[in-house]
Curated annotation (Swiss-Prot):
Residues 1-47 form the F-box domain. This is Putative F-box/LRR-repeat protein R542. One of its GO terms (biological process) is SCF-dependent proteasomal ubiquitin-dependent protein catabolic process. SUPFAM superfamilies: RNI-like. GO terms for cellular component: SCF ubiquitin ligase complex. The keyword Nuclease does not apply. The keyword Repeat applies. InterPro entries: F-box_dom (IPR001810), Leu-rich_rpt (IPR001611), Leu-rich_rpt_Cys-con_subtyp (IPR006553), LRR_dom_sf (IPR032675). Gene3D superfamilies: Ribonuclease Inhibitor. Pfam families: LRR_6 (PF13516). The lineage of its organism: Viruses, Varidnaviria, Bamfordvirae, Nucleocytoviricota, Megaviricetes. Transmembrane segments: none annotated.
């Protein structure tokens, strides 16, 4: 019987069934219905429903007993919501047919996601009786009065004292709600998590209303030491745009700090007063000093991208870090890398003073990123010892990376080479001596030709994009590949019969070649063939021939 299959497999099967057939399945018998609804309650994020072609009454009645329900991007309307009055957690994000009237039926909901709905106004938030968590992201009509309705069940007069709280809001997302002001914080005193990113500027004095906040995402603050003193329980702070001026102390419980692109006053932060900090994003903080990194000695994940004043001395304090990004820290040299030998991930893109010798210190780092930039900068050399699981190389404009470098990557499993026009066919021969290499990605490497691909014949996963020299003949060399991905290679107009191939992904910038599709029809042994095409391609082209079930056409704007 179907229900005797492993739970994980059943979850995948049921989550892939289209909504109309899913509801028919619920009507088979009580045993099947109870099993599926239990699974639905336990894994609400695995299921989403589109009610467009379903009988509204029949479909919703089966969902009445479900406590956690995901109906995001569906066609559910106000009349259907009245059948879900007892739901505990409901996701109706991006449901354009929902209005204030529909929300009036959800009096008992505890967790609600109604984001991306321009129909919801302040009046729609006054009927909740138990709500604790709500997502109002991109609900552009919500104002401070709506927050009053949410918390007290009514709007307040200017001289009216704050009444008894009806709903104790613990978590609220007001991102991109441009009519909300920081004055609404006085109604969210018991909140533990507030997101007000990309809204109007927040004023310092309003922080006094949220002393119990643990997660705060907020924009445009000019935060002083006095204002932050009240936030003694905060664990995670994300300051958005408008370059906050920060003098942080008293944040001894803070575990995550995201503070990117602060050009001024960053040098005044004393990280020693944040002993519990484990994650910090300080990218673009150009005035960050070496001495400040002493306070980050216990941080496990650290982003110092484009912190131009950081030197090897600063890295000497970071011997315990596990994941670090020091890309475009131009003062870092080979000597500094010896302090990162215990890391699991190191990004050294654009570190122009790092040479071959520096890679000796990184030989035990599982994941190493060298390059991966769209700027016309050249990256560091990689000659030397290397035990890299993942390597990215890009913009090799000064011939710093040649085939010789690849000989040292004996334990590399994935290599990505981007926009390196100095990499030629002969360089790829180095890959034949890398037994652990399982994936290679060649992007914008226009000096690689068909002959170069012959060196990749034993690599399981091969991706080739934006190459104007490789043709169908080159693909024929990939005899042992399990997955091949082709994007924007105009000379590839047919595929050879590669018997070991299990998945093929093909992206075209122009019209779909019918000869190519007929060619693919012959390959039943390939489990999945994805053909991505531009929206402007006439779909009538696809109806002129019979298409095998293993071929899937996907409209893609790329």
């Amino acid at each position: 019987m179907l229900l005797n299959l492993p739970y994980e497999i059943l979850l995948i099967i049921f989550s892939l069934i289209e909504s109309k057939k899913f509801f028919k399945l619920l009507s088979i018998n009580k045993e099947v219905r109870e099993f599926i609804l239990t699974m639905l309650n336990q894994n609400p994020k695995s299921f989403s429903f589109n009610l467009k072609n379903c009988n509204p009454k029949d479909s919703i009645k089966y969902l009445q007993s479900v406590r956690c329900l995901n109906l995001s991007k569906s066609t559910i309307n106000d009349d259907q919501l009245k059948y879900l009055s007892d739901v505990y957690s409901l996701n109706i994000s991006n449901c354009k047919s929902i209005t204030d009237r529909g929300l009036s039926f959800l009096t008992q909901v505890v967790k609600l996601n109604v984001s991306y709905n321009g129909n919801i106004t302040d009046n729609g938030l006054k009927n909740f009786q138990r709500i604790k968590k709500i997502n109002l992201c991109f609900c552009g009509k919500i104002t401070d009065k709506g927050i009053e309705n949410l918390v007290y069940g009514k709007t307040l007069n200017s001289d009216e004292p704050i009444p008894t709280v009806i709903n104790t809001i613990r978590k609220i997302n007001l991102q991109c709600c441009m009519r909300i002001t920081s004055k609404c914080l006085q109604h969210l005193r018991r909140a533990r998590s507030i997101n007000m990113l990309y809204g109007p500027q927040t004023y310092n004095e309003d922080l006094q209303y949220i002393p119990n906040i643990e997660t705060l995402k907020i924009d445009g603050l000019d935060v002083s030491d006095k204002n932050l003193t009240n936030l003694k329980y905060v664990k995670y702070i994300f300051f958005g745009r408008n370059y906050p001026v920060i003098f942080m102390s008293h944040l001894d419980k803070l575990t995550k700090l995201i503070l990117p692109n602060v050009p001024e006053h960053i040098e005044y932060i004393d990280f020693n007063k944040m002993p519990n900090l484990v994650k910090a994003d300080l990218s673009g903080c150009i005035n960050l000093l070496d001495e400040q990194l002493k306070g980050l000695s216990k941080v496990r994940k650290l982003n110092l991208k484009e912190c131009y004043d950081i030197t090897d001395v600063g890295l000497s304090y970071l011997t315990m870090v596990k994941k670090i990004n020091i890309s475009y820290c131009f003062r870092i040299t080979d000597s500094g890398l010896k302090y990162l030998s215990n890391a699991d991930y190191v990004n050294i893109c654009g570190c122009l003073k790092i040479t071959n010798e520096g890679f000796f210190y990184l030989k035990k780092v599982p994941k190493l990123v060298v390059g991966y930039t769209t700027l016309s900068l050249y990256d560091c050399m990689i000659d030397g010892c290397g035990d890299y699981e993942y390597l990215t190389i890009s913009d090799n404009t000064k011939q710093l990376i040649t085939g010789k470098a690849f000989h040292y990557l004996e334990n590399t499993s994935q290599i990505k080479i981007i926009n390196c026009n100095n990499i030629i066919d002969v360089d790829l021969k180095s890959f034949t001596n890398l037994p652990t290499l399982s994936k290679i990605d060649l992007r914008y490497c226009n000096n690689i030709t068909n002959q170069g691909l012959s060196a990749l014949c034993n690599i399981p996963i091969v991706k080739i994009s934006n190459n104007y020299q490789i043709s169908s003949k080159g693909i024929s060399y990939l005899t042992n590949s399990k997955k091949i991905s082709i994007e924007s290679c105009p000379k590839i107009n047919s595929f050879p019969n590669l018997t070991g191939l299990k998945k093929l992904v093909f992206k075209t910038m122009g019209k779909i070649n019918m000869q190519l599709i007929q060619n693919l029809n012959e390959y039943y042994h390939i489990d999945t063939i994805h053909v991505y095409y531009r929206d402007f391609i006439d779909r009538q082209h696809l109806s002129s021939i019979k298409i095998n079930d293993n071929i899937h056409f996907i409209s893609d704007k790329f």
